[in-house]
């Protein structure tokens, strides 16, 4: 998943969607995700404390210098609740932190920032380029020294071996890959995930990218993506992943497998496939 040189990012980076948390009539997708965020949280627990419903926040491009703040947020609101991390009791993992920030140079990841300058939501995205026929796929797990995280990367490598999104969309050369969508639990229910996703759609339209790809290891994440108009293009049960003859991942219900979701934001034409 390498970066293709795209049009000047300076214009993109200067654009902000200035909005008030309570004014969810600006975007239909924000109204939808407000309902979804009310119903679903990663942990399933309510927000720890109430927040000001009228607090202003902006949607901004994540900058390289935001890395530390992004990781701090993910440690609090994402890493500990991700099903595979939880099952393996992953704990502190510098390799995971580095891996999470890897797509930032693609200049298509966005953050929600409150009036105090705090990051209250992120959508980390990367760019996927169609591989050349003679390309040898790199295995992310080969260079990982953390034994538990290596298991997760090995699973991701296996999924890439079994499924190629470019086979589904034979006319596409570049696809946006949604990596991590996370919202501060104290600000859920305010449509932030919808605003982050809408900004990603705008990026796609600005750069002629037609397809949005998201890999979900969480049942809840897959349901949210469905509500956002994504559809399933690949599925693999955790019970079917047996690299050494034994099942590696047995996360708690309802997390039963990997789902790859896709959405056509532009005029993409999908090939006829069977799940």
Swiss-Prot record:
GO cellular component: cytoplasm; nucleus
Gene3D superfamilies hit by this protein: 3.40.630.30
GO molecular function, one term: arylamine N-acetyltransferase activity
Effect after changing residue 241 to F: No effect on the catalytic activity towards tryptamine
Effect in UniProt of substituting residue 216 to A: Does not affect catalytic activity
Annotated site residue numbers, Acetyl-CoA: 227
Expression sites (tissue/organ): In the adult, expressed in the midgut portion of the thoracic segments and the frontal half of the abdomen (at protein level). Expressed in the epithelial cell layer facing the lumen of the gut (at protein level). In the brain, expressed in a sub-populations of neurons and astrocytes, and in a set of distinct stripes in the optic lobes (at protein level). Expressed mainly in serotonergic neurons but also in subsets of glutamatergic, GABAergic and cholinergic neurons (at protein level).
Main location: cytoplasm
Entry's EC annotation: 2.3.1.87
UniProt xrefs under CDD domains: NAT_SF (cd04301)
Documented effect of changing residue 213 to A: Does not affect catalytic activity
Annotated compartments: Cytoplasm; Nucleus
Entry-linked PROSITE patterns: GNAT (PS51186)
Gene Ontology BP terms: catecholamine metabolic process; chitin-based cuticle sclerotization; dopamine catabolic process; melatonin biosynthetic process; octopamine catabolic process; regulation of circadian sleep/wake cycle, sleep; serotonin catabolic process; sleep
Function in brief: Catalyzes N-acetylation of tryptamine, tyramine, dopamine, serotonin and octopamine. In astrocytes, regulates sleep homeostasis by limiting the accumulation of serotonin and dopamine in the brain upon sleep deprivation. Is not essential for sclerotization.
Protein name: Arylalkylamine N-acetyltransferase 1
Species of origin: Drosophila melanogaster
This protein's encoding gene: speck
């Amino acid at each position: 998943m390498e970066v293709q040189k795209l049009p000047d990012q300076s214009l993109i980076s200067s654009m902000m969607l200035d909005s008030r948390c309570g004014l969810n009539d600006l975007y239909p997708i924000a109204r939808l995700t407000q309902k979804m965020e009310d119903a679903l949280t990663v942990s399933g627990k309510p927000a720890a404390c109430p927040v000001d419903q009228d607090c202003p926040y902006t949607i901004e491009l994540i900058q390289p210098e935001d890395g530390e703040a992004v990781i701090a947020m993910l440690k609090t609101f994402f890493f500990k609740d991700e099903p595979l991390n939880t099952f393996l009791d992953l704990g502190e993992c510098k390799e995971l932190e580095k891996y999470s920030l890897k797509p930032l140079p693609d200049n298509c990841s966005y953050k929600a920032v409150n009036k105090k300058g705090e990051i209250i939501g992120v959508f980390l995205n990367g760019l996927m380029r169609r591989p050349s026929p003679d390309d040898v796929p790199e295995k992310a797990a080969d260079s990982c020294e953390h034994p538990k995280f290596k298991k997760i990367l090995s699973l991701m490598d296996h999924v890439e071996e079994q499924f190629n999104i470019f086979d589904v969309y034979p006319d596409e050369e570049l696809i946006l890959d949604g990596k991590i969508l996370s919202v501060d639990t104290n600000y859920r229910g305010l449509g932030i995930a919808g605003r982050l996703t809408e900004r990603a759609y705008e990026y796609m339209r600005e750069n002629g990218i037609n397809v949005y790809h998201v890999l979900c290891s969480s049942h809840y994440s897959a349901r949210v993506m469905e509500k956002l108009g994504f559809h399933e293009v690949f599925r693999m049960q955790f019970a079917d992943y047996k690299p050494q003859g034994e099942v590696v991942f047995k996360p708690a219900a309802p997390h039963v497998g990997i789902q790859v979701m896709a959405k056509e934001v532009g005029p993409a034409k999908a090939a006829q496939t069977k799940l």
